[in-house]
Regions:
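Domain-level signal for Mg2+-assisted phosphodiester chemistry and nucleotide/NA-binding surfaces
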Residues: 2-135
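Nuclease catalytic cores that cleave nucleic-acid phosphodiester bonds
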Residues: 107-243
């Protein structure tokens, strides 16, 4: 399956302007004793391992440059959403863009260009060593959402993931408190969010400029006359014990 380092637009091409004003968590966020006031925020949680798997399933392999999501476009979309929320709430809302990912042993040099490109756009990256199959960033994403909520600064939440098992209950609870709650991803893999009466769903392809070309998406509703293969969502090996 493709790695998320292959799903970012070529960072050396100048597609990631340094001036994109996306809020990044203050370094003292890691200090429990910090008393710095934090802005009211619209939080984006990007579940890199999950979206990586989803994009690979749609493409049936590793993406070419045309099918790598452009995070500068995602950043601009997030800025627009925060402006809309600011107008609705009549208060200043700052976007906080975060990406959560694993780093395999010995893979730091491979992942580093991708991480640096994201940080250059204005995304904060939470990276965690992939020590075994059970080491993932799911609890860390939930912990960050809960932290911002407990701080009283969470005025909107966007989760880019199809992982309903991890996020659904949490997001629906937030939605019932009046916090605007959005799921961002691929509709083929997030039926739980598409069908939800409390959550908004936005397909990644609906965001202007995220992909250079339309994704080669095939479904039972738009089959070509000659027929088409529908790729599996997970490899057959996932049926084996201990395999993801």
């Amino acid at each position: 399956m493709t790695s998320m380092i292959d799903t970012i637009h070529e960072h050396s091409s100048g597609s990631f302007p340094c001036s994109t004003p996306v809020f990044v968590p203050h370094p003292t966020d890691n200090d429990a004793t910090s008393h710095h006031a934090k802005p009211q925020g619209l939080l984006l949680i990007w579940d890199a391992p999950n979206l990586d798997m989803g994009l690979g399933a749609i493409l049936g392999g590793r993406p070419t440059a045309a099918y790598r999501p452009r995070f500068d476009a995602i950043g601009r979309w997030l800025l627009d959403r925060s402006q809309q929320l600011s107008e609705q709430l009549e208060t200043r809302i700052e976007p906080e863009a975060t990406v959560f990912t694993n780093v395999a042993p010995g893979g730091a040099d491979v992942v580093r260009p991708w991480v640096e490109a994201l940080r250059n756009v204005g995304f904060a990256v939470f990276a965690k060593p992939k020590l075994d199959d059970d080491t993932d960033v799911d609890p860390d994403m939930l912990a960050h959402i809960r932290r911002r909520h407990s701080e009283g600064v969470l005025k909107g939440i966007i989760v880019a993931s199809a992982d309903g098992q991890n996020f659904r209950d949490e997001l629906e609870q937030l939605a019932t408190t009046g916090i605007p709650t959005t799921v961002l991803g691929f509709h083929e893999h997030a039926s739980w969010a598409v069908a939800s009466e409390t959550l908004e769903f936005v397909d990644l392809e609906e965001i202007p400029g995220v992909f250079r070309e339309p994704l080669p998406r095939i479904s039972l509703d738009n089959l070509p006359e000659e027929g088409a293969w529908l790729q599996p969502f997970r490899p057959l090996s996932s049926l084996l014990p201990g395999r993801p």
